[in-house]
Swiss-Prot record:
PANTHER family, per the entry: MITOCHONDRIAL DISTRIBUTION REGULATOR MISATO (PTHR13391), PROTEIN MISATO HOMOLOG 1 (PTHR13391:SF0)
Biological process annotations from GO: mitochondrial genome maintenance; plasmid maintenance
Protein's organism: Candida glabrata (strain ATCC 2001 / BCRC 20586 / JCM 3761 / NBRC 0622 / NRRL Y-65 / CBS 138)
Keyword Mitochondrion: yes
Domain of life: Eukaryota
Protein name (Swiss-Prot/TrEMBL): Protein DML1
Chief location: mitochondrion
Record's subcellular location: Mitochondrion
Amino acid sequence: MHEVITISVSQRANHLATQFFNCRETLLYDNTKDKVNDPKIFLNPTIDRISKTVSYSPRALLWDAKTGNGSLGSYQYSDGSDYYFKNDDDKPSDGDLMQTHPVIPKSDYQRALDAGLPEPKLNNSNTKYWSDYARLIYQPSSFNILRDWYHDTDNPNRPDFKSLKDRRFDKFIIGEEEFKSNYLVDFFDTNLHHELEQCDTLQGFNIITDIDNGWGGFSSALLVELRNELPKNTYFSWAFHESDPYTVSYTRNTKVQFNKKTAEQISNKIRATTSLSQESDLFIPVYSDPEYSNWEIGSLVCPLFDGLNSVLDGTDTEKRRNMQYLSELLQNGDNNRKIISSANMIRKDRIIDYLYYSRFPTQSRKSSSAVSEFHVFSKCNISRSNKEMKDNAEIKNVTNKQINTYGYKFADTVSDQFKEDSNYKLCLTSDERCRNVFKEYGDFVSKYIKYDDDREDMKNSLENTASAYEFGWYDDSDSGDDNY
């Protein structure tokens, strides 16, 4: 058994993790003769030998702001003594209950689950918290809460310092210092240690995070220490990228324009991308469409996240792969190329493009080829189907590989507009557009980050990353100046 632990860092990341584990839960009720997946890879089994039953909890460590868990208490389903509503008849007689914030009522969906009743239909208004629709019971050690930062339902991705509406968790350096100063020792010695004890042979981690705000600095600091502690494991980083002046420029075909707020956003993005991509074996820059809520984003991205991870837990040993295999396959012999630049879900009726780099304005090239044609360094197709795929034998040429895995089984918590058919193909590509992004980032640092101590280190790191994705000849004057 080769377990995978998911570490989700931010409210938005927790929505994706929740949708993923809800999909894992639906597979537990698969009544077919041959199970398609091994639940123990992503879920931790607890065996009750008296009742001869098995219960499962996610192999997960969730980070969120205070009250970000909604109505869910850490010990709500294991020990009720820390969790009260207005009726406190069972509270300890030797102490007083201190209420530090208004009680968040349990969602109708959770009440229905507890009572064994039909669940109500989900929408944006009743899914403000990821816990509103979580179907599995998490271990208390899965929950990690920022002590001084509070969740704000009006701005859920940027916690509020002590709920004073005065300071936001919106800078890379704030998140980085927050982890290093307050959580480094406690996290590794307690909750992470407990999660590791539940694993027999851990193969790696999925790190899900935001990078436009303080969570990018927080997850970067966490991953650096995690990699130092467990250097032999494999790390996949899933980084949510919000819309910014680059994506606006791409969409509207206009010049890139920055103000103070968006320049800070890009600075956060660059620092988090540099750190996470260096420490990860694969870095997946997911685009977070501002038109969707966090619940909808989790629903939209789940086929991508679930699809790649389905390769890791299939019961068919001929089709199952591990995280190291996937990372080496997509790096294709060069461990400096760790970034997935394109990830498309392909069905008969449509194609969904999941990644941020596909929405980035393109620099000019000396080559006479069309600027949209990027050189492909490696490509992996993951075909999902519950039927035997005779025509899709695994391809083993240098740049294009194909992997077959079992079909997608979405949970009822997925938004109706994103409930996909079980059969589809994921196309993951590492190509030359990464150079385009990092050259633009380098131009940004040169123009807008003038006095930071790490300025030269950032420029060198960005230049080195860009050079890893070069192919052919470029103009000496090749830069993104014309976009500004």
